[in-house]
Structure formats: C-alpha cells, structure tokens
Amino acid sequence: MSKRILCKFFAHGACLKGEHCEFSHDWKDPTNNICTYYQKGICSYGSRCRYEHVKASRPHPSASSSSAVPRPSPASASNTLACAFLPGVAERDLSPVPSSSLKPTWNLDSLHQDSVDEVKTSNPGTVKPEELPICSFAAAGDCPRGNECPHIHGTICPTCGKCCLHPFRPDEREEHKKVCEKKHKQLEALKLSQEIECCVCLERVLSKATPAERKFGLLTECDHAFCIACIRNWRSSSPSTGMDVNSTLRACPICRKLSYFVVPSVIWFSAPEEKKEIMDNYREKLRSIDCKHFSFGDGNCPFGTSCFYKHAYHDGRLEEVVLRHLDAEDGQTVIAKDIRLSDFLENMHI
C-alpha cells in the first residue's frame, strides 16, 4: 500500500488522468473527502453535496523553515489514531519519514479529524435518503464496494440500461427518463439519416466531403430529400424571361409542390411530428437573431412580416406587426407590404 491519499475523483468514477494521476487509485489508501468549497463557504450543492461538509483542522505554519521545531513524538499518536479509525492501514506504513519527501497536501491530524466527524455524522437517522448522492460506479455498471458502498445504488433506466435513477428523487428520475428518451430518438434518427440520398446529386447527404455539405434541405410542403447545397442552388437560379418564379424555382424539383422556404437540418425525419419539431426549432432560433435588413429600425426589411428574424429597435422594443388587408376586384384579399414615406422621397427628384 502506498502512502498517497486516495483520489477523490477516482472514488466517484470520474478521474480523467488514469495512471498518470498524482493521487492514489488504490481503495486501501486513506481518503480525504472534505469539500473544499464548503471550507470557503461557497458550496452551492448544500446538503446534496457528495463530499463531507466538515471543518478541517489546519496545521499551524512555522515562522521560518530554518527555525521549525518538530512536534514531540507525533508518529506514535498518529499511528494509533490512524489504525483505530482506518483498519486497513498498517503501522509499518505510517512510520515517520523525512519531511522533504512529503507533499504538504494532507496530514494525519486532519485525517483523524475527518474520521471523527465521519463517525459523528454517519448516523442514518440524521441524513435523508434523497440527500445521499447516487453511486457513479454502480451507474457505470459495477461498484467494487458492493453492499458496503456509502452511496445509493440507483435503479435501471429502461432506455439507456444504466443504474442511474435515484430511488428517492422522483422528479429527477422522470426528468432523466425524458432526456434519455429524447437522446435515444435523436440517435435513431441520425442512424436512419445515414442512408438518405439527395434526389438531385444522388449522393448520401451525411457522407459529403465537407461538414457544411452534410445537411438536409427540408421543404415545407413535400417530403423529398435534398442536400442543402443542391436545393439552394436550384432555388437561386435565374429564371428565364416570362417564367413564373413560384412555379419553377420555389417548387420541388420532383413533385412541383410550392415551398416558400428551406429548413437546414443535420438529421432526416421519420414522422410528420418530427418534421414539424425541426421546423419550429429552426424558426425559434432565427427569432433570437437581429435582422440585418431591419437594422434596429434604421433599415427596411424586404420580407416585411414574413421575415423570420427579430425586428427590434435600439431600445429593445419589438416592431409591432400590423397587417394591411386589401380587397381586389376579383374578390380575393391580399396583404399589402409596409409603405414608408422614405420610399416616395427616394424616387422624387427635387
């Protein structure tokens, strides 16, 4: 057994350094499970923190390194206390060594204080089950401590198959199920999208050369698959003389159904509800971006009320949308665009 302290990240199954970690990854080594944020008074987890909220005793620093006076025979008292509270620690491993070979990260006095506080706070009647953290080793698949683990072993999630559901936190358990099911559906949709080919270039969309090309261009009125580059090139072509834009460029190249806009997406939908969700999320994202044509009220957006971007003024006020309905001679009703005085003044030659 080494003389290093047990890595607190390894104890919770979250050490990323592995064999290169400067702390011990041996369960026989002593632990120092004190919350450092609690010592500073800024722990935001409170009673739900997985680390101990106790006041650690700190060694008194000496005036200078040359005048430091060692404590009278600390080895025997420290060994006795450590062996009493840590049965797995042998006295031969706690023999005094030169101070130059030790790192001042912890001492036996603080370890004894931690053990005393742990004994005082280990009364099961003082800690509620919902306040205990879930064992990350059991959630990952196997806990080496088994029934002696101080943390709670969760129940199995029916979607991901991990023991990560806290049995005493119903809200957290339901939230995990919803998030897990959503991620599972996204992975299934991404798996199905790998085989979808573009109807124009006949290539697999997600197998394109560059990441910018690995997107689908969804049309609102039909379910034909196109890559974003092909459908945008189709709709941006210059129409011939006398050609109707709506019936040629804005229509689907396959079924000729009219779609007014294209929605980029990294996955392909398998149901109408999924397509609607993708389009709603796309519109919601654009609403948070300021329109460059509107320019906080200083410009004029050619799309008017049909613009998906945010029309906000310098003071944060949103543009009030007022639709003007005009009745035509044939009985149809059309929506007129906003007419500004500046449009007339620009055409006047004064």
UniProtKB/Swiss-Prot annotation:
Keyword field contains Glycoprotein: no
Localization in the cell: Nucleus
Superkingdom of origin: Eukaryota
Gene3D superfamilies associated with the record: 3.30.1370.210, Pneumovirus matrix protein 2 (M2), zinc-binding domain, Zinc/RING finger domain, C3HC4 (zinc finger)
One GO BP annotation of this record: protein ubiquitination
Zinc finger intervals, C3H1-type: 1-28, 29-56, 129-156, 285-314
PROSITE patterns assigned: ZF_C3H1 (PS50103), ZF_RING_1 (PS00518), ZF_RING_2 (PS50089)
Annotated GO CC locations: nucleus
Entries under Pfam families matching the protein: zf-CCCH_2, zf-CCCH_4, zf-RING_2
EC number, UniProt record: 2.3.2.27
Keywords, sorted A to Z: DNA-binding, Metal-binding, Nucleus, Repeat, Transferase, Zinc, Zinc-finger
Zn-finger segments (RING-type): 198-256
Gene Ontology MF terms: DNA binding; ubiquitin protein ligase activity; zinc ion binding
Name of the protein described by the UniProt record: Putative RING-type E3 ubiquitin transferase C3H69
Native organism taxonomy: Eukaryota, Viridiplantae, Streptophyta, Embryophyta, Tracheophyta
